[in-house]
């Protein structure tokens, strides 16, 4: 609550990492409900993301979709598209919500699968590019975004050619070392913007009694830096 109250004027979105609530059992679920209810009641203009990375067979995905997008009323949820369109469809069936599909993630292990090349006659492509090509028509830019790691700016222009009008959620800036200048230069275009995520560098800006003020300063610094870049 203190973090939200101190940083909201510098944010367009809050990404709630559900694992840090779920690991606490029923108490954690209650805390997550309190968090999203507080955001929806006090800051309804701020876009909320359930960073849950769900995705399963259709009837199970429907339960996940109902849990986060209906019952908890998040604006969006991160989804793993690995199981295909029928695992994603239940999330898309809920009106006025977004799914955020994993495409190219910021972790070093993304090279193990996402950056593998697929060779076909007269075509060589990365796995992540095939994921985008396959999934971009499951929904459209009014209900689908993509996760693209801020530590991989060399692939942004390639991705923008594939999905010029989809919002990108870009983690990896801040504690993971992504360069905001390179992110903005390569991921933004005249069609649509981006959501740049900075979590640990804001939340853990200080462990002292003034942690909320430190978080506000860290969030404001990010906002100021982005404003300078976008001038």
Regions found by a protein language model. Give the residues of each.
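Conserved N-terminal beta1-alpha1 strand-loop-helix module at the mouth
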Residues: 1-47, 123, 143, 210-231
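A general structural detector for well-ordered alpha-helical segments in enzyme core domains, enriched
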Residues: 3, 31-35, 64, 68, ...
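Active-site beta-loop-alpha junctions enriched in small/polar residues
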Residues: 19-21, 53-57, 82, 104-106, ...
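Active-site-adjacent beta->alpha loops and helix N-cap segments on the catalytic face
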Residues: 23-41, 57-61, 81-96, 151-161, ...
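Short helix-capping segments at alpha-helix termini
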Residues: 41-46, 138-141, 162-165, 188-190
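Conserved anion-binding
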Residues: 48, 56-147, 165
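A C-terminal functional module that forms or caps the active site or interfaces directly
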Residues: 150-197, 201
């Amino acid at each position: 609550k203190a973090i939200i109250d101190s940083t909201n004027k510098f944010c367009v979105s809050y990404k709630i990492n559900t694992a840090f609530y779920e690991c606490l059992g029923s108490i954690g679920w209650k805390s997550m409900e309190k968090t999203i209810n507080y955001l929806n009641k006090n800051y309804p203009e701020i876009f909320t993301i359930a960073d849950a990375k769900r995705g399963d067979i259709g009837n199970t995905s429907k339960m996940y979709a109902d849990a986060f997008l209906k019952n908890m009323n998040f604006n969006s949820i991160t989804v793993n598209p690995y199981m295909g369109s029928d695992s994603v469809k239940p999330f898309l069936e809920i009106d006025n919500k977004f799914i955020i599909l994993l495409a190219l993630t910021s972790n070093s292990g993304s090279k193990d699968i996402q950056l593998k090349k697929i060779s076909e006659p007269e075509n060589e492509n990365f796995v992540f590019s095939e994921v985008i090509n396959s999934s971009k028509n499951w929904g459209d830019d009014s209900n689908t975004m993509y996760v693209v790691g801020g530590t991989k700016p060399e692939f942004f222009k390639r991705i923008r050619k594939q999905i010029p009008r989809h919002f990108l959620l870009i983690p990896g800036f801040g504690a993971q070392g992504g360069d905001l200048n390179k992110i903005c230069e390569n991921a933004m275009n005249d069609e649509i913007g981006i959501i740049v995520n900075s979590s640990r560098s804001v939340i853990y800006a200080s462990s002292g009694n003034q942690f909320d003020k430190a978080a506000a300063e860290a969030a404001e610094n990010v906002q100021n830096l982005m404003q300078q870049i976008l001038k």
